[in-house]
Amino acid sequence: MKRPDYRTLQALDAVIRERGFERAAQKLCITQSAVSQRIKQLENLFGQPLLVRTVPPRPTEQGQRLLALLHQVELLEEEWLGNDNSSDGPLLLSLAVNADSLATWLLPALKPVLADSPLRLNLQVEDESRTQERLRRGEVVGAVSLQPQPLPSCLVDRLGALDYLFCASPAFAARYFPNGVTRSSLLKAPAVAFDHLDDMHQAFLQQNFELPPGSVPCHIVNSSEAFVQLALQGTTCCMLPHLQVERELRKGVLIDLTPGMVQRRMLYWHRFAPESRLMRRVTDALISHGRDVLRQD
């Protein structure tokens, strides 16, 4: 059986996390040549490349499996040995989460874990349709995702759904939708997306108004909180989590432009198996809080 040296695995992990050999060498306090040599040793052991030498480098499928193994072993080892504060500081917990969860329910869910556990949280923000891929690549040990099916050697639980409403300010509605939201009026109404892969707004318009992708003018803004601000100041209409704008809707500073047309996104919690005690606490906290604030029907 091929048993990797965890020192070489840590070099592979550093190259991926630091997005290059030079910064990985600085992180590990060794030379860049030593980093390359350790990865070469690992590749020789497994008889195949473990890195794709792009900019930034990315792991091959075998590299992803090895990184997942490393992260799982690190969690289990630290807890089994009781090293709450190792020489590298508190344990690093890397999770992939979507921006809307981060802006609404996720941090309150993690509050008891952060209060009781000495750890460093590394939240990697990604669209919920792509967070699972970060888990597959071994970049994180847990992910909030749209995908209901677990990856091999992983566990999954349903968290609940975020309901999205098509919102804008009253002034925006009066300007762009004086006669209500129609197919023709939507063509002139500025929208906003998180990035060029964010298709929620387009999917909503296509499903309910038969507008093809790319039909409406759309800003790109990488911030869930900025979506709300843009809507409040009358700049755009956009899909917003009901959980995020309940107060604004009650006050009337935002309005639901299409009552009854709800875009529901069910969220799932993925993580490696077996779970460490820390990950079990994270799982319990997310599921418990999700039951309180996310839609369960």
From Swiss-Prot:
Gene3D superfamilies linked to this entry: 3.40.190.290, Winged helix-like DNA-binding domain superfamily/Winged helix DNA-binding domain (1.10.10.10)
DNA-binding region boundaries: 21-40
Source superkingdom: Bacteria
Domain HTH lysR-type, first and last residues per copy: 4-60
Cross-referenced InterPro entries: ArgP, ArgP_gammaproteobact, LTTR, LysR_subst-bd, Tscrpt_reg_HTH_LysR, WH-like_DNA-bd_sf, WH_DNA-bd_sf
GO molecular function, one term: DNA-binding transcription factor activity
One protein family per Pfam: LysR_substrate
Keyword terms, alphabetized: DNA-binding, Transcription, Transcription regulation
Record's function text: Controls the transcription of genes involved in arginine and lysine metabolism.
Family assignment from sequence similarity: Belongs to the LysR transcriptional regulatory family.
Quaternary context: Homodimer.
NCBIfam families, per database record: argP, PRK03635.1, PRK13348.1
Name the record gives this protein: HTH-type transcriptional regulator ArgP
Organism: Edwardsiella ictaluri (strain 93-146)
